């Protein structure tokens, strides 16, 4: 197998991987070809967005052998064919296993900052790449954070400025603003002369049913299970509203004016990064509590302090 430049290994979900995209684009520009081992759906997305040149399915049985005593020869060939391997993982054991296979440079970076470390996840990734001398802190003279310097508008030239996409789901229901509030926002947006379309993933079809049964708003509804199809759809929109979710991170990265509704999670770490992002979040002493596992409110009080008018004002402030 021909030797290539950089292999990324990331076991995380959509939001975690999208948070690395600004860094991966910098690496690709500097080193050339790049591949990633990750979930298939995310790998297809990364290829669709031209973040990587190739991807390998993390869920394939061959890669499961990395955690066994007998590693699949195909996996060995893949790992040995890249000059640099960047492993986003907390696992020292996995790092040790990869070291036993490849003679090339291997760098392990924690995929998220430690609890209590007040740094954005994208800045955390970039800072560690600088620490490993894989990137230079090239923007120190301008004062522009590394994580902000590569964002642009990746939408289709024919995008519809009147179309607002709404994704009311998240990886955890504890991070979801009530769907009834999203419906109220959608109704107000339509009353202002814009179009609204809702997006639901496979784990959110129950929310989709609630929306369809409510009959309180007339809007297109999309049930999507392929992230690359989601990306194509987002590229056609004029704005986006969502929770603290991987889809919100993706929308912001693509360049949509994005409103992200935050409750118990911390926007200092997880705010979507893009050219036009507004976070709506109440100022409560108990927040953020999601990362520490101390969420104790039955109704999650922080979401109760966010009103449809707040979110409507935020999206209108971005798209008019």
Q: Locations of the language-model features?
A:
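Catalytic machinery of carbohydrate-active enzymes
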Residues: 1-320
């Amino acid at each position: 197998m021909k030797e290539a430049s950089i292999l990324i290994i990331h076991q995380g979900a959509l939001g975690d991987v999208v948070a690395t995209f600004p860094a991966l684009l910098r690496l690709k520009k500097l080193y050339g070809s790049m591949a990633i081992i990750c979930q298939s759906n995310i790998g297809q997305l990364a290829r669709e967005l031209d973040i990587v040149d190739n991807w390998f399915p993390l869920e394939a049985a061959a890669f499961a052998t990395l955690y066994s005593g007998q590693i699949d020869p195909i996996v060995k060939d893949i790992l040995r064919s890249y000059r640099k391997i960047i492993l986003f993982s907390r696992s020292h054991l996995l790092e040790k296993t990869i070291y036993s296979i490849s003679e090339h440079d291997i760098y392990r970076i924690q995929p998220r900052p430690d609890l209590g470390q007040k740094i954005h996840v994208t800045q955390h990734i970039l800072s560690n790449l600088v620490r490993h001398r894989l990137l230079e802190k090239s923007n120190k003279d301008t004062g522009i954070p590394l994580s902000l310097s590569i964002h642009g508008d990746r939408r289709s030239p024919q995008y519809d400025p009147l179309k607002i996409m709404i994704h009311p789901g998240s990886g955890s229901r504890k991070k979801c603003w009530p769907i009834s509030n999203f419906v109220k926002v959608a109704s107000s947006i339509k009353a202002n002369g814009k179009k609204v379309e809702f997006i639901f993933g496979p784990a959110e079809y129950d929310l989709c049913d609630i929306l369809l049964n409510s009959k309180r708003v007339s809007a297109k509804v999309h049930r999507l299970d392929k992230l690359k199809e989601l990306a194509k759809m987002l590229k056609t929109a004029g704005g986006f509203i969502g929770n603290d979710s991987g889809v919100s991170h993706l929308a912001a990265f693509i360049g949509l004016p994005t409103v992200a509704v935050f409750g118990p999670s911390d926007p200092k770490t997880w705010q979507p990064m893009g050219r036009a992002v507004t976070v709506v979040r109440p100022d409560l002493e108990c927040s953020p509590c999601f990362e520490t596992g101390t969420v104790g409110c039955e109704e999650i009080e922080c979401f109760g302090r966010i009103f449809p008018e707040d979110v409507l004002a935020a999206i209108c402030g971005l798209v008019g």
